[in-house]
Amino acid sequence: METEDIILGKAKYEDWRSIYRNVWSRPETAEYMVWKVTADEDGARERIQRTIAWQETHDAWLVYERGSGQAIGFAGVEEIEPHIYHETGIALGPAYVGKGYGKQILRLLMEYCVSLGGQEFYYSTRAGNLASRALAVSCGLTFQHSEQKTDRRSGKIYELEVYKRNLKNSGSGMLFF
């Protein structure tokens, strides 16, 4: 799956260095996510092997910047009920935020779900993640509800906001935006 600027593709071992440098080592990227920062290059080499294994059986991908070929993020979806999908996380390294890549990723994910017969798409974000909230709204998702969750890393309570979009197929597998 690709756009003019990005490609969603399955991880390869040689991606460990760029995904580590751009995403996994960055606390500002992990802040609103449920994963921990990878401390060093050895940890990144181990993590890429787990990522490759995970992606073999899940609808999850690394995000590659088309111009540089570097792994700059990751994204995924899962079917939570028949024809109902939820994103499983969208992350971009801080140097790649604010370039429109998030919107391109989210649109690709929704188009992918349409191609699988998806009828509803859910997206969630922590209440404090204003950029993620703005991304949801900009892609036509509407707020549904919020719920309290406990951060598995810190044990702190946070508010998770859930957004939804009904997926409409144009007959060509493309969404109407």
Regions found by a protein language model. Give the residues of each.
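Conserved GNAT-fold acetyl-CoA-binding loop/helix
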Residues: 28-50
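A short helix-loop-beta-strand connector motif used in the catalytic cores of GNAT acetyltransferases and
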Residues: 49-62
